[in-house]
Amino acid sequence: MSTGGCCVNSPAASSVRYLTAEDLLNLNHAITGDPMVRDIHLLHSAVRRPRLLLFGEPQFPTLAGKAAALMESLAYHHLFVDGNKRTAVQAVTHFLARNGQHFSYDAARDADFVLAVARGEYDTAAIAAWIEERMSANG
């Protein structure tokens, strides 16, 4: 099923600017001072997940969906020794900024949600809806 141009948040796949494994390592280093990867395969999986295709169609067609897939992969799978949830939030912030969007995260307001993501209490669609509520165009 094609999503066509139905959604404002549906970028052309070639125009999306994704984070790399190096970007994630740098974010975790800035947070913890010493990025220690628990599982390098999970790191590469987290980087690839927002780009997934299912029967030739993006599994996550919106920027919020791609950001949610990234957040879930980082927070839930605990691929770093420390700073997974903080890295997940920063990864979403940087991914959206690279793609012309501002992410409004307030630790006092939003920390419980991120903790719940880390415990596996929300699916990717719910995470995407939460991110969408906190997104606005840069500028």
Label for each model-derived stretch:
Residues 1-139:
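FIC/Doc superfamily catalytic core
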